[in-house]
């Protein structure tokens, strides 16, 4: 999958000084490149038989919704604060460049439903780790994590449940 790196733009000092942001938008506008990423994920995820894919705001929504549609399973959105109606469950966490909070609707997850967590990029693992804890807090059974890109030098896998699947397709 390394040949697909040519579609990933690097933007220095975004969103904060010292960060090199990996912009995946060019992949989404190239159907063949996006398809090449999505098919292996679709095949892998289908073997795990999740009830839902949970996508993390906002870039995780793009591929998570496409995968959920293709696999004919539900999509759960994990959002930043104050973006969801009704009662929510939330958790605070640390980012590579600060702190943030994630929330889901209180009754959106059926108890013990199998959920695969998806985001576009694994960096420090802070966001995905927090989202995984949130899924469990809401009563879901987290069965694994999938990402398009992993920044290996940041060792994000160390902040995820090591007993679960962690799949990434492009590594830096």
UniProtKB/Swiss-Prot annotation:
GO cellular component entries: cytoplasm
The protein's enzyme class: transferase
Assigned protein family: Belongs to the purine/pyrimidine phosphoribosyltransferase family.
Record text on subunit structure and interactions: Homodimer.
GO biological process, one term: purine ribonucleoside salvage
Record-given protein name: Adenine phosphoribosyltransferase
Subcellular location: Cytoplasm
Catalytic activity: AMP + diphosphate = 5-phospho-alpha-D-ribose 1-diphosphate + adenine
Keywords: Cytoplasm, Glycosyltransferase, Purine salvage, Transferase
InterPro entries listed in its UniProt record: Ade_phspho_trans, PRibTrfase_dom, PRTase-like, UPRTase/APRTase
Pathway: Purine metabolism; AMP biosynthesis via salvage pathway; AMP from adenine: step 1/1
Gene: apt
Organism encoding this protein: Prochlorococcus marinus (strain NATL1A)
